Amino acid sequence: MAYDQAVTERVGRMTHEILKVGVIGAGQMGNGIAQVCALAGLDVLMNDISQDRMNAGLATVDGAMARDVAKGLLSEADRKGAMDRIKTAAAFEDLGDCDLVMEAASENEEVKRKIFTRLSPFLKPAALIATNTSSVSITRLASVTDRPERFIGIHFMNPVPRMQLVELIRGIATEDDTFETAKAFVARLGKTSTVSEDFPAFIVNRILLPMINEAIYTLYEGVGSVEAIDTAMRLGANHPMGPLQLADFIGLDTCLSIMQALHEGLADSKYRPCPLLVKYVEAGWLGRKTRRGFYDYRSGAPIPTR
């Protein structure tokens, strides 16, 4: 009898369905995650540190879908239905009935640890916790929660609505049913998942960010200008955008955080962040979001800054 009950409980967990998703962070990644979840028919609660930020996130989602309607990529009925499914949540207590809570805050380990420490007590026992981190150890983040076995990395690519890939990363304690539930969730969103082990920056950013960092070194050492480097990689390597333009799009602070995680986590000098990247971040030149990075966006059309 005890065996039958255990099997039933395990099967119940394996078929755990995600119907309601909490998203912590209403910025670029968070609002993108909220958008794709709502379009997939899921109810979404979006949380951030202020109502103004949550309202801005809602406006961004609405604007993005309105543009898709204008292009014929989305029906007005689907846009309205998705917007009706996204609500704001002022406090972590409001996320208590979510089946999955996705953290999409800034790429700062201390910030994420504080979020998970505060969040865990308010969630129902069956709820999964996921992080959208692009570089931080899943095992370390899971350790501050009350459910490391129900914790997983679900790393979306930017921009979330357009990019097909999602990385799934298990921590050392992540159970099989958590992984299978996360995999089914990603499939419901119409995206493709790939599995990475819990190493710094996982797969995509371990390959991508050193390339961007090397492009910044190429600029720093005077090998080529911003325009020359980006043109070379667009036309010579068939990249859709140059590495410096891509760095601005990602955010130079995020690029630096990932390179620091690689450098510290793997202890290899080849991952040392370029001093020019450090200087730009110190200056507050973070790319498109601050309207200045390797390009100046303040006058409209991007102008190379070096």
What positions do the PLM features span?
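Rossmann-like NAD(P)-binding element
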Residues: 52-53, 67-128, 136
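NAD(P)+-binding Rossmann beta1-loop-alpha1 motif at the extreme N-terminus of oxidoreductases
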Residues: 2-67, 71, 122
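Amphipathic alpha-helical segments at domain termini/boundaries
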Residues: 8-11, 21, 35, 80-100, ...
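Hydrophobic/aromatic beta-strand patches that form the interior of the parallel beta-sheet core
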Residues: 45, 87, 102, 152-154, ...
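Rossmann-fold dinucleotide-binding core
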Residues: 128-197, 202-206
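Helix N-cap / loop-to-helix initiation motif
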Residues: 50, 75, 175, 224-228
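NAD(P)-dependent Rossmann-like dehydrogenase/reductase catalytic/cofactor-binding core
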Residues: 2-15, 180, 187-198, 217-221, ...
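A non-catalytic, amphipathic alpha-helix used as a structural packing/dimerization or gating element
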Residues: 52-63, 177-188, 231, 235
